[in-house]
Amino acid sequence: MNWNEKPKSATLPPLYPKSQPPFLHQSLINQITTTSQSSFSYPGSNQEACMYPGNSNPISQPLLNIQNYPQQISVSDMHNGTVVASHTSVERITYANVNGPKQLTHNLQMSSGVTQNVWLNSPMRNPVHSHIGATVSHQTDFGANVPNMPALQSQLITSDTYSMQMQMIPSNSTRLPVAYQGNQGLNQSFSEQQVDWTQQCISKGLTYPDYRPPPKLYRYSPQSFLPDSTIQKQNFIPHTSLQVKNSQLLNSVLTLPSRQTSAVPSQQYATQTDKRPPPPPYNCRYGSQPLQSTQHITKHLSMEVPQSREMLSSEIRTSFQQQWQNPNENVSTIGNFTNLKVNTNSKQPFNSPIRSSVDGVQTLAQTNEEKIMDSCNPTSNQVLDTSVAKEKLVRDIKTLVEIKQKFSELARKIKINKDLLMAAGCIKMTNTSYSEPAQNSKLSLKQTAKIQSGPQITPVMPENAERQTPTVVESAETNKTQCMLNSDIQEVNCRRFNQVDSVLPNPVYSEKRPMPDSSHDVKVLTSKTSAVEMTQAVLNTQLSSENVTKVEQNSPAVCETISVPKSMSTEEYKSKIQNENMLLLALLSQARKTQKTVLKDANQTIQDSKPDSCEMNPNTQMTGNQLNLKNMETPSTSNVSGRVLDNSFCSGQESSTKGMPAKSDSSCSMEVLATCLSLWKKQPSDTAKEKECDKLRTNTTAVGISKPANIHVKSPCSVVGNSNSQNKISNPSQQTALSMVMHNYESSGINITKGTELQIAVVSPLVLSEVKTLSVKGITPAVLPETVYPVIKEGSVCSLQNQLAENAKATAALKVDVSGPVASTATSTKIFPLTQKEKQNESTNGNSEVTPNVNQGKHNKLESAIHSPMNDQQISQESRNSTVVSSDTLQIDNICSLVEGDTSYNSQIAKIFSSLPLKMVEPQKPSLPNQQGIGSREPEKQLDNTTENKDFGFQKDKPVQCTDVSHKICDQSKSEPPLESSFNNLETNRVILEKSSLEHATEKSTANDTCSSAAIQEDIYPQEIDASSNYTPQDPARNEIHSDKAPVLYLHDQLSELLKEFPYGIEAVNTREGSVGQQTTYQTSEDQTADKTSSDSKDPADQIQITILSSEQMKEIFPEQDDQPYVVDKLAEPQKEEPITEVVSQCDLQAPAAGQSRDSVILDSEKDDIHCCALGWLSMVYEGVPQCQCNSIKNSSSEEEKQKEQCSPLDTNSCKQGERTSDRDVTVVQFKSLVNNPKTPPDGKSHFPELQDDSRKDTPKTKHKSLPRTEQELVAGQFSSKCDKLNPLQNHKRKKLRFHEVTFHSSNKMTASYEQASQETRQKKHVTQNSRPLKTKTAFLPNKDVYKKHSSLGQSLSPEKIKLKLKSVSFKQKRKLDQGNVLDMEVKKKKHDKQEQKGSVGATFKLGDSLSNPNERAIVKEKMVSNTKSVDTKASSSKFSRILTPKEYLQRQKHKEALSNKASKKICVKNVPCDSEHMRPSKLAVQVESCGKSNEKHSSGVQTSKESLNGLTSHGKNLKIHHSQESKTYNILRNVKEKVGGKQPDKIWIDKTKLDKLTNISNEAQFSQMPPQVKDQKKLYLNRVGFKCTERESISLTKLESSPRKLHKDKRQENKHKTFLPVKGNTEKSNMLEFKLCPDILLKNTNSVEERKDVKPHPRKEQAPLQVSGIKSTKEDWLKFVATKKRTQKDSQERDNVNSRLSKRSFSADGFEMLQNPVKDSKEMFQTYKQMYLEKRSRSLGSSPVK
């Protein structure tokens, strides 16, 4: 079982042993438990048990055991280890093995190339199919489960195959021989490789990017991933089938891990590619692959009719071996051969024809020479031939596009049929649920149903979604290929199908059970016929009559064969047969519903692993495949049969859900299936589910919540008590099971580890997200689904979320799916990547849990799911922590994968983080009593409801409970940031969607929320803390909180890395989405404590991680910083914490934690303010850590908050006007509102408008008052700038509103006005310091503090900011004057004008769009407008020069940059445009100054800006989210640049910029965050907590660049010039993720920061070489670079320390006069160093990512 444990397929293998010991154990245990499986799996030939152990690949031996081929077993041990249940496969493999399977394998490898798909390791792949014969037979019902483990990996492979088809094809060739050679060794190594490869893919972004590259390869499929689930699912269905094959290949890979890992993926890919584009390649390949499907069936038949098959297997084996001996003949006669075999064995003919087909396929695969059906030859050869494989891929893509179109037509037809069925009555809600999802999820439903019927990816719940779909698509494509291969393979396949339908019309589904020989034959056929024919039915609703006839024949066969759902299955299938398209709808609905039930069972199976899995393989194979087909067409006919057949919906679901719930309850595979299906189903099903939970609550409750929910209205208590406890375990357990299934990678150790990550790349995180949300959320499902839809509409995970958007349209249709937490988990999980993902999570959980509420088992179920399921799902609950973390990890991994597809990926990433906060809050609440689950999800639902103003009154209190519970919990247990993240996300969505509505709702429920929230918080508080702590791992930030926890560690590592890589994409997504949550995500990166502010998408991960690492560690390390950070927090808090202050009394812990957490994070970068607030926040999150000065801030902010609240009339307007401006403000204020005010859902908006109102109010009111206006500008400008950056949509409105008022001079104002605000606010209130840590300030203050700390001015600034104010005023004015009016007047005016011009332009993204010359023109245009404003800002900032601490730092940097720009305008210009784009809002002052310094370089900077705008487009969100950090980074970069003096070309400069950003940002931010006293501690902190601190910051940075990991490779070239912050983020991400550069950078940064303190230029120069190497180089380069670094540092230190250090020191103190010479020196030295480094880099890193 070692292999199982390693790939963590052990969970699935236990699943399979559970349900189908003979078959699933054969396939799974063969696959997973090699020796154990042999004796267990194949009772038919126990002799092979010995052989099986003797057989290095016991996988094939059980089949051989069944086949009684001990001799061949040993011969085909290796292959037959893979050919677990494949007589044919065993024969072939035996033959191949006997005949030299390695030879054949290599022949297949080389000759087959792509025929690897066609069974390049025809023996191996037959074994895989043989294994998948059992697996596919079980994958026909639970075959998905078996393939799910391997198929998940295969899905990874498959996904990889999409993008890496060419890659994987060679890998297949390479790994095929290895697989064949080292079956045993590879067996374990395969699991390792699978896991590693999966992780590889995940880390490489292959998980989803590979899946996303298929959009490139199969553009329609991934793009259709959501909308065209059918094709993508078809792609995945072929994947699943192939993955089922690959599962057996994985079994082979168990035997042949290296080959199987790559080869199976490649085979899978090729085969899937063939099957995916069945028409061109599948014609030939389909000959192979349908035959492979036949091999599936044949092997399944072999496995399932072990003894009677044994003889036939022997005969067929002999004949096939003969045919193998004559592969060319077989290849030419594959169709005939299959027909021959089919004719030879009528029942067995299917085994034999299938085997013949399999053998023929293998023959074809091996001998592609003649005609691998014309396409098969190229295909198999193309597996190795990359060019041919590419051509094949092109063909396949075209075929898939055709399939997509056909599926779209089918979806339309099915939708129409569903609508008709919905009109018919029972299907109304279900059909509504599926009508839209049918189009979007129709294919996925079909494919999922087919996946479950054919491949039955039941166990892999996450994988099921994608992987089942691939299997179904594979089947569909195989079926289509069969249809396309009508002359060849469809004759065979259709003959096979016809014979299967005629000969085994019942066995087709009978085979879904480990039944008699025909049953096994049919099972094999069903895995193929179900997969293929169901796919035919799905693929061809047009062909649905024929296919449905086949499926109908299969339906009766299922009825016959399936013992439990047999009669009902017959009825259902008869009903479905009556409705062929309805059958397809039923397939879709069943796919969704049965998959929900099967996923429940699969979850249970995963939870109950082996018994349930095996049970579910018989049950969910019978009942799983039948419930997949039947329960997928029966409960899913309850769902879709609700659509398809009311009778079938009721009786079918009752019978299916009765038969199935017993099995569903007994095995979670149905849940897993259902969850996977739900994943692939549209998340709008949440709304549909809500309605169906209301409407079909008795019927559909089980359908949605527990897949057999119609029967389980009581069964939702039983199936939702069992299945819904399991569905709550589908929420918790399905969360855990989904988590387990999806994340059992880490937790349960299922093979789905890889496939899930890859396949459910988008879905899986969402599933986890939603499952997390689902567990607690059932209170207000009705309202949320609608809100969920906007989320769906916002941005889909690739096509998935587009599908979800369509599903949002098909709210009613999706309501059935929404009924099930599995579906809602899967569905809303999919949706949750969107900003409303949390809403959707709420909605999904609400729907899912509304059904439990209807079932009245929601909380009981939650508790039983959380507690009772903890028995089965105690691991699942841990899985939920670790698995949810896994979920997050998967999410992030998936998102990381998606990150490559940044565009379609971004929105979802943002919303994954949105849902992650909710996840964090919701899982917290699942731990909490029902109150909290209701309260926590309900508030978010209320946010949605508030948006809708639906159940506002009902949810008014609960949102309060939930909100403040979440806040309080968040405050105490870091639940607050996640919840606030969720709320911010929800609020962002809500603000975006229904700002005024939410404002009204906010105002309505503010008092109630405040009161009941405070009360409930305290009630739920401890539990929520526990839930928060328990659930923390689920959130990336929570992961960081629990990063020290063992379960979380692995996931946390992945999540941390992924978050580092992933949030980047989130930012880009958010910016593009223009959603508040995304903007808040930006601020989370910027204001690491602003995570509450920006807790939208990134907060949960960024904010929590940052807070944990920053606040907690700073608590530990910098407790002293509490006061000072608090003072700084006060600066920012006049605006931000004013709303907090009101709520602070109620949420004192929350308010300091929330308000100051963000501010103190800002101040943490600036000062140690983050520690005060973060300390308070951490105190609240973790323990009663003193609130630092949050109470003072609260007191002072209470007044302002009250004032702002008094401005509530303006709130709505300002929320409307300034909400976009206030997106950042909302981020800033909203978290505080969320954290502080129990009226978070409303108050978040209330305070958001209030803050904005305050700032807007102050803008007209105190516009002439420098502080109010400055503060106002700080709030508006910072947030405006950031929001403008973040939300182009909102920015345009906001731009006009605020950019002219406060926006981009607000960046300089933020530097100037910010400082003014800081001064005045400090003078007025000590709260003003909170204003300083405003998001923009976060970047500036840390840098400025570091800078000032480095400079004499900054030394007193950090410790005492009041002193610093005065000193900063005088000193900075001095310095401004010293630096010349260039900085104070010229630079300020000039660059401020430029900055405002840029800001206005950049805010409107004119700068991004016309950054180059138009940007300059726009800047000239804006000069008048922004000049006036900048004059005001300058007046304010001149008035309060003291507050120039941030600005002084910026100016200092600008001055240095001006000098360095003068020295090297190119580099500086590039920095400036990057700043304009990346840090445009927050770095605008820096930008403006540097731009003002060099207008010339603006043109070159324009190019860079264009580049960085290109990067911004892809990284725009990433870049924009990190305005503060970008400001930090940019300031650091500027300092570095100034120190470098522009010597370094852009590349090196960018490398330096990246590393300097990293080091400067992390160091400066960290050091800035600490007072000078703490700086030494900070150094210790860096050393001690450097990793975590960097993680914390890296998480911010990670959020900057989680997506850009690849982006920072691909776009690093751009970004090094274009996006300094993304570069920085990439650098830090690289440090954290890619190269583990964080520790090096942090340590280096510590030194650099120390030097920088003393000598700004030197540390930066020093850092620049350090970072240049580090960023550009990999770990090696860092290792190699140590010497180079030392050299360069020595040179830099010798030169720059003497020149730049002294001159820059004097420049820091005296002005930029001294800076120019050092800059020149540093420029020269840096040029020298650049050349040196470039040479070194070219040597060490010929392909450096930076270049």
Curated annotation (Swiss-Prot):
Give compartment(s).
Answer: Nucleus
Extent of Basic and acidic residues compositional bias: 937-956, 1089-1101, 1217-1226, 1242-1261, 1689-1698
Q: Which residues form the signal peptide?
A: none
Quote one Gene Ontology molecular function term: histone methyltransferase binding
Q: What is its main location?
A: nucleus
InterPro entries annotated for this entry?
RESF1 (IPR027866)
Write the protein's name: Retroelement silencing factor 1
What are the leading ranks of the lineage?
Eukaryota, Metazoa, Chordata, Craniata, Vertebrata
